[in-house]
Amino acid sequence: MDDVAIVSFNDSVIALEHFSYNKDNYALIISDLRMPNLNGLELLKKVKKLNPTVRTILLSAYEVDNDAIFQQYMKEGIIDSFMEKPVTISDLCQRVRDEFQVYQLASYVK
C-alpha cells in the first residue's frame, strides 16, 4: 500500500462527479450510509456502474441488516464490505488492507 493516495469529500455529488472523471484511478471507495443528496447506497451503486472492479466499504451507525435494499446491494456486489460505527482505526485499516488484497487478486485474474 505504498502508492496509496487518500481523497476525501464532504459532498457525495461532488465525490461522484470526481470519481466519474477518475474511475480507473480508484481501487477502494469508503462511504457513510447517511449523507445529504446521495446516500451511501445510492453513491456506491453509481460508483459500481462506472467501475465494477472498485471495492466498496459502507459505514453506518444504524442497523441495516434487515434493510431489503442493503441486502440486495450486498448480493449484487455493490457493497463489498460493511462496518458498523463506531469503527476503530485498527479495524478500518485491516478492512482496507483486506479489500486491497481482494482488488489486487482480481486484477491478476484479468
Residue ranges and their predicted role:
Residues 42, 63-81, 90, 94:
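Alpha4 helix (beta4-alpha4-beta5 surface) of REC/receiver domains from two-component response regulators
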Residues 59-61:
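Hydrophobic/aromatic residues positioned on beta-strands within the core alpha/beta folds
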Residues 84-96, 100, 104, 108:
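C-terminal output helix
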